Amino acid sequence: MKKIFLAILFVASFIAFDASAQFRYGPTVGVDFTTLKFKQDLFTVDQSVGYQAGIQGEMMFPGIGFGIDIGAMYEQRGATLNLGEKKVWSSQGYGSHRSYLHYLSFPINLRFKWTRMNGLEDYIAPYVFGGPNISFMLAHSSIDALDYTTADLGLQVGLGFEVLKRWQIQASYNWGMTYCVKTKILDDHSAKNRTWSVRVVRFF
């Protein structure tokens, strides 16, 4: 994790001192489709739908298509856990429970945008991106069978289209790299976030 933070700091410092870089920002909203990937398949986990909203910034180097995007956003993740499928939990009265995970997330991505398409880029320009996503838990469901961690580190990749140089529509997948939830009864039964996202950004 230390290496990731150092890499982020290096990239941010490099861009901050480049006078030719173009920065803009705007609001973003989207939908999350999340599940929790446990170490062992002791019970089924159903994907749940959440939402996200926040601010996204973009800094691009003119002429070469490379840049960086950063964001600060609220995200609702989680999944439905069918704990009642195992006697160890059903005997305590547990059944199917929706586990809500509320995060403040800070994605930082390197991106490449196709900007030399003979004028077509003024109307539509595809782009790809990838980088770390650092999230801090704000709140969670009260499920006594679970323990929760305070922070989550993920890696995400995605693609999208810029429309009329103002709107961006993108889809991404986030791999949780650290465990966010674990069961209290079984010490080694923990889970990581797995999230598909669809998001719209409107830049000023």
Can you describe what each PLM-predicted range is?
Residues 58-63, 110-119, 163-165, 177, ...:
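Outer-membrane beta-barrel proteins
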Residues 31-35, 74-78, 112-114, 132-140, ...:
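Transmembrane beta-strands of outer-membrane beta-barrel pores
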Residues 24-26, 35-36, 42-96, 168, ...:
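Glycine- and aromatic-enriched membrane insertion/assembly motifs of diderm outer-membrane
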Residues 32, 107, 190-204:
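Outer-membrane beta-barrel "beta-signal"
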Residues 23-29, 51, 66-70, 106, ...:
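Transmembrane beta-strands of outer-membrane beta-barrel proteins
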Residues 21-23, 45-51, 100-106, 124, ...:
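Residues that define the transmembrane beta-barrel architecture of outer-membrane proteins
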Residues 19-23, 61-66, 115-125:
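Short loop/turn motifs that connect adjacent beta-strands in outer-membrane beta-barrel proteins
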Residues 37-43, 80-87, 121, 140-146, ...:
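Outer-membrane beta-barrel translocator domains and adjoining extracellular loop/strand segments
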